């Protein structure tokens, strides 16, 4: 692999003492691969390190962390307007790793790192909310958002993605739907929503396939609504076959407008955003990402 250009790894501070990762990086460096490593400590670090990556002339910026880290790095990359931006590499080190998992990124660190450095760079979409906040994986609203933001860190560290489901079961007494109206291209719905998923990617909340047909290079966002008419069936339908389920509403559009009579909160790759009005739009081909050739998220 000695002929591959330099890369810069932006590593979430929680993974700074990951010994297997240190060993994998050392082995690649011994093969002649140049890998710069930077560790995030506070919000804004990813943007600063992407700026540094451009000054260093690297061709790949690797996001080492969970969905939140991938979001920060990818958002910084799409801000580049002059010249060709570095490609995005994925190194899943978070609690759930929903985007990386659905994209087929290997769990083994050495294999994921090699893919992040040497994989083919494919153009993929991102999404933007209210002309400001971006997400690469999914925007989720409703009960699911409350669960992912409230799940204790110790529970996530111990159980990983399944911690979200367990915490959800513990909070069944708080199940309340959000009344809202959603419009898109050839789509209109209004009613009580228990969970709303608007996906560029397919899964969120620790492996729940909220938007199972989503693709990251089709110029569309997938919508799935779990209505509040039957709360328990809607909650568990992500674990079962959803065909002909009257509690599930699906849609696809390049944009969605959401209006609620009261404040609701969306979780954008782990970052909460509250309000009553949301305009969510796809950004086609917003960045290049190094993905496996059989990535299930590509058409």
From Swiss-Prot:
Keywords: ATP-binding, Cytoplasm, Kinase, Lipid biosynthesis, Lipid metabolism, Magnesium, Metal-binding, Nucleotide-binding, Phospholipid biosynthesis, Phospholipid metabolism, Transferase. ATP binds at residues 40, 66-72, 95. Disulfide bonds: none annotated. It is found in: Cytoplasm. The active site is at residue 271. One of its GO terms (cellular component) is plasma membrane. It is an enzyme of class 2 (transferase). Binds 1 Mg(2+) ion per subunit. Ca(2+) may be able to substitute. GO terms for molecular function: ATP binding; lipid kinase activity; magnesium ion binding. It comes from the Bacteria. Its cofactor is Mg(2+); Ca(2+). Residues 2-133 form the DAGKc domain. The keyword Nucleotidyltransferase does not apply. GO terms for biological process: phospholipid biosynthetic process. PROSITE patterns: DAGK. Its EC number is 2.7.1.-. It holds the Pfam family YegS_C. Mg(2+) binds at residues 215, 218, 220. Belongs to the diacylglycerol/lipid kinase family. YegS lipid kinase subfamily. NCBIfam families: lip_kinase_YegS (TIGR03702), PRK13054.1 (NF009602), YegS/Rv2252/BmrU family lipid kinase (TIGR00147). Probably phosphorylates lipids; the in vivo substrate is unknown. This is Probable lipid kinase YegS. It comes from Salmonella schwarzengrund (strain CVM19633). The lineage of its organism: Bacteria, Pseudomonadati, Pseudomonadota, Gammaproteobacteria, Enterobacterales.
